[in-house]
């Protein structure tokens, strides 16, 4: 039995070596990434097993993703190699036009990952897991990928969802709102991961306490409310925990939220309280933003403990 299953599209990332407009960048670093893959790595590094249900192309990038994922301890037995399409890629423009922020340019339309479908879901495998995770990204990339998430959520004992609304992937923000709210209304979500921007789209509020009240009315049990450079708040049973962000040099913030989410969810599943899980999630996201690459610095449980005990800002 696997502890956690994530559904989504793994991607190859080309991260600009220097900040600035992509038209002036000559050198890039290649990384394996993708929101759900990043989430899985955080889960594994906190001592739970995790499987990624996905598709990659029958190409060198697809092989790279499978080999890298396996090396990180992810169960890759449910990553399907699709002979009809290609592995998606994206480029990161760092520090321009907003310092310490990154912009993503995707080349993924029609990719193998977007061809994820309900037929890729092994029903018994999903039923026997403890929790199924996905994101608004997977809900956005294609109708069949959305249906795969719905099928997995139907079978799941427990669910977590990261709203992760990427406007470039949706036909409209209204469509994003309609789709994600339909999921929240239909399924009990054990842990919802979101932020003020997404909550403004979904509920037309940004205040964390008001957001928790409204999400709770929709059946959300635990809310992880990310505040970027201001830290994050977690809620459960009307108990609220806040953890401020650490001040560190920001190389690339991409992937920080995935590291926080995977760390928080995995520790919560192990019976840790929201304060402990949140502190470790903040530690993970802090380390990730200091380098290029989404998941290489996602810490193990032990390294996060050391960070929390020794690092002061």
UniProtKB/Swiss-Prot annotation:
pH influence on activity: Optimum pH is between 7 and 8.
Entry EC number(s): 2.7.1.178
Q: Which SUPFAM superfamilies match?
A: Ribokinase-like
List ligand-binding residues for substrate. Answer: 34-38, 90, 106-108, 166, 258, 294
**Temperature-related activity notes?**
Optimum temperature is between 70 and 80 degrees Celsius.
Residues binding ATP? 164-166, 226-231, 255-258
Name the pathway: Carbohydrate acid metabolism; 2-dehydro-3-deoxy-D-gluconate degradation; D-glyceraldehyde 3-phosphate and pyruvate from 2-dehydro-3-deoxy-D-gluconate: step 1/2
Q: Which CDD domains is this protein grouped with?
A: KdgK (cd01166)
Its top-level enzyme class, in one word, is: transferase
GO molecular function terms attached to this record: 2-dehydro-3-deoxygalactonokinase activity; 2-dehydro-3-deoxygluconokinase activity; ATP binding; nucleotide binding
Keywords from the UniProt entry: ATP-binding, Carbohydrate metabolism, Kinase, Nucleotide-binding, Transferase
Catalytic residues, chain numbering: 258
GO biological process, alphabetically ordered:
phosphorylation
* Pfam annotation, one family: PfkB
Q: Which reaction does it catalyse?
A: 2-dehydro-3-deoxy-D-gluconate + ATP = 2-dehydro-3-deoxy-6-phospho-D-gluconate + ADP + H(+); 2-dehydro-3-deoxy-D-galactonate + ATP = 2-dehydro-3-deoxy-6-phospho-D-galactonate + ADP + H(+)
Per UniProt, subunit arrangement is: Homohexamer; trimer of dimers.
Would you identify the family this protein belongs to, as annotated? Answer: Belongs to the carbohydrate kinase PfkB family.
Q: What does this protein do?
A: Involved in the degradation of glucose and galactose via the semi-phosphorylative Entner-Doudoroff pathway. Catalyzes the phosphorylation of 2-keto-3-deoxygluconate (KDG) and 2-keto-3-deoxygalactonate (KDGal) to produce 2-keto-3-deoxy-6-phosphogluconate (KDPG) and 2-keto-3-deoxy-6-phosphogalactonate (KDPGal), respectively.
Give the NCBIfam families listed for this entry.
KDG_KDGal_kin (NF040938)
Could you identify this protein by its name? 2-dehydro-3-deoxygluconokinase/2-dehydro-3-deoxygalactonokinase
Which organism is this entry from? Saccharolobus solfataricus (strain ATCC 35092 / DSM 1617 / JCM 11322 / P2)
